[in-house]
């Protein structure tokens, strides 16, 4: 194992540690427990969107796995069934855990896990972006801390916007924009964003076209 690889691994572990500390400081940490649903239901005496997201997941998990459309939530809604996408229940997580529904407790929730993973990735991508401009690990940590504590992020937690907490998807798009064009990575990120929230898909699409324009400009005007 090369020294550079060890150094990079230690840096990433440091970011994960920082993200975990801020996750615990911000949420208390207990939301990651799969059987903890109390935080989703009125613990703040405020009606948020979390209740809707969880209830939609309960209906979806009890529908057939092989159905068409895949994310159709036939039992959810009044008379006219809806789609899991419309209830902001993070489709990529829902379809993953639906495959194991027979092994999950009734009060199972994946939203806490999603938030924790989002904290880690929210800290990682700013670090990777800033590393393209400076070799300072301290500056990278400060940059990650800024994005982890940004009010625009923590605001989503307060109002129960779990899917929109995945703002790291936008940062990942910026990271791809700053690197060499790779169509496969853009397709993967676009697909992922669509399985999290349509808003992210729209933003990633704009970044993708910006990348195409930038790449085309470098071909037409190679000396710019």
Segments from the language model and where they lie:
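Membrane-interface coil-to-helix junctions
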Residues: 22-122, 150-152, 161-166
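Transmembrane helix-loop junctions and nearby membrane-interface residues
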Residues: 27, 102, 212, 216-219
